């Protein structure tokens, strides 16, 4: 994670920002991982006598992996779940070793732009810690975050608000002072359940599937943080 210092960060001296913290989801929001994740899950489902089409996979996005195993594969024993989690992770590693993860277009530029504003930045991902570390180290993205929360650190997965509330807590901020950046309906619902304003990026889902978000953007290309803040602040 980035060093805890503010000396190199500019501040907004004209109009105070309506938010003190920005909380990002990871998969689909910052990194392009859906295809690799789908094929890893498809192999797991096949191994345990289940089928998984891409259409059936999409509603799983944002759900903690252990919950997918319990609720969709039907295996609930804790040791079995741990074993399958490792199998899935190993498949995922194989896939991204052959085809390295890429960032969502212009995501890094947007993260860098936040360094020009007096805001803290957190990552709140349903992914397990080992996956998060591997992917963000590969992309050199850890430097952009003041706090990180992974799916194995909270009791309830999205759409429960736990992960975003924990991220706000680690930033030392209240929920009302934080905005969330998400890419999926389940994540947007979690942000709203946390009573946080949410901007959704239409990367893995069509804009009409993200209607619960306060603001929807097509991409980070030309996305202006101040303008987004103003739109969020004026939304109902």
Predicted regions and their residues:
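N-terminal helical cap/lid subdomain that shapes the substrate entry/recognition surface
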Residues: 4, 8, 15-109, 113-117, ...
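Conserved SAM-binding loop
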Residues: 30, 103, 121-125, 156, ...
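Residue-level detector of anion-binding/catalytic polar loops
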Residues: 51, 120, 197
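Conserved short-loop catalytic and cofactor-binding motifs
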Residues: 29, 56-57, 95-98, 120, ...
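Short, flexible loop segments at the rims of nucleotide/cofactor-binding pockets, characterized by
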Residues: 97-102, 126, 193-195
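Asp-based, Mg2+/Mn2+-dependent phosphohydrolase catalytic module
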Residues: 2-20, 112-115, 128-236
């Amino acid at each position: 994670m980035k060093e805890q210092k503010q000396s190199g960060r500019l501040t907004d001296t004209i109009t105070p920002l309506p938010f003190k913290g920005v909380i990002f989801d990871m998969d689909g929001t910052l990194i392009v991982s859906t295809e690799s994740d789908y094929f890893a899950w498809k192999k797991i489902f096949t191994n345990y006598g289940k089928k998984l089409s891409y259409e059936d996979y999409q509603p799983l996005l944002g759900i903690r992996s252990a919950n997918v195993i319990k609720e969709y594969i039907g295996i609930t024993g804790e040791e079995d779940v741990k074993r399958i989690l490792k199998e899935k992770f190993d498949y995922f590693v194989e896939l991204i070793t052959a085809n390295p993860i890429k960032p969502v277009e212009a995501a890094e530029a947007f993260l860098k732009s936040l360094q020009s504003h007096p805001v803290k930045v957190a990552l709140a991902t349903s992914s397990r810690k080992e996956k998060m570390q591997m992917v963000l180290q590969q992309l050199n993205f850890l430097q952009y975050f003041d706090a990180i929360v992974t799916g194995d650190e909270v009791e309830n997965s999205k759409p429960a608000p736990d992960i975003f509330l924990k991220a706000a807590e680690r930033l030392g901020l209240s929920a009302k002072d934080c905005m969330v950046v998400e890419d999926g309906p389940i994540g947007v619902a979690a942000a709203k359940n946390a009573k946080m304003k949410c901007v959704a990026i239409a990367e893995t889902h069509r804009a009409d599937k993200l209607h619960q978000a306060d603001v929807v953007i097509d991409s980070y290309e030309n996305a202006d943080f101040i303008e987004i803040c103003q739109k969020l602040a004026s939304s109902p």
